[in-house]
Amino acid sequence: MKKSLIALTLAALPVAATADVTLYGAIKAGVQTYRSVEHTDGKVSKVETGSEIADFGSKIGFKGQEDLGNGLKAVWQLEQGASVAGTNTGWGNKQSFVGLKGGFGTIRAGSLNSPLKNTDANVNAWESGKFTGNVLEISGMAKREHRYLSVRYDSPEFAGFSGSVQYAPKDNSGSNGESYHVGLNYQNSGFFAQYAGLFQRYGEGTKKIEYEHQVYSIPSLFVEKLQVHRLVGGYDNNALYVSVAAQQQDAKLYGARRANSHNSQTEVAATAAYRFGNVTPRVSYAHGFKGTVDSADHDNTYDQVVVGAEYDFSKRTSALVSAGWLQEGKGADKIVSTASAVVLRHKF
């Protein structure tokens, strides 16, 4: 009996050496407060306030790889939200995939982040709860950042350069909503630059609604030939961090009422931080210019400031204190929102 157990153990050793599985995740919870004041014709027309204990993006995941020989590996990941507020359900509701990795690069299929979403860490360095995302995060530019049921290829890095291409079929993206994505990256001696592009035939998203006996994808009703271009650049030496970002959206609107219309939307953002021992203070500013892809006349003008600091208790446990101010519109018609949060985070 003992010999059989020893034989089984020895037989399992090569398998354990070539197939690695990692459990990982993060628990993030804290207290947040928010206040929103809407002005109409120069007068206060609506006030909303609140405070709550909230989840700030907790998650849990499993990932692994298997050595297939000749430098080829099978890679996989299954990740899902794990809210401490008990509001996340289901498996694989975050980035989840299976693929192959080798000297040629990595190819994956599944629910994959787009190149736009991959640049988010250098655009939005903040975290928020359910009701404060528009104030405590640089969320205006992030509206086009999504995860797609798609296939994606990422190249190996060469002389600091790397790239990616991604395709989401129309049957996974709503009515005629197939999309194409491209990403280019460069890093050298702390300097970095990123480009991310999205090209979509009709709108974006996976939900549909019926309007005047026609079915449309939402949230981008009537949007045709959507393009999103984002440039990000900066410097990071593990103490000083600076980044700037610019995003241009462009679309043609379809439908009898909006024939031949063509609109664009431009937004910019910047972030600076410096690490003093265990403390890292940070500040971000974002601005949106007039006009959106849905309407050239829509006043999308906004200004936003987020300030805060992180304190590292250890490599895995940290705290974040932040406060944000957002003004949408200007003059007599505007919405002014403020929010603050204290968050405790642990990664495993």
Swiss-Prot record:
It comes from Neisseria gonorrhoeae. SUPFAM superfamilies: Porins. One of its GO terms (molecular function) is porin activity. Residues 1-19 form the signal peptide. GO terms for biological process: monoatomic ion transmembrane transport. Pfam families: Porin_1 (PF00267). Gene3D superfamilies: Porin. The keyword Ion transport applies. PROSITE patterns: GRAM_NEG_PORIN. It is found in: Cell outer membrane. Serves as a slightly cation selective porin. Major antigen on the gonococcal cell surface and it may have pathogenic properties in addition to its porin activity. GO terms for cellular component: cell outer membrane; endocytic vesicle lumen; extracellular region; pore complex. This is Major outer membrane protein P.IB. Disulfide bonds: none annotated.
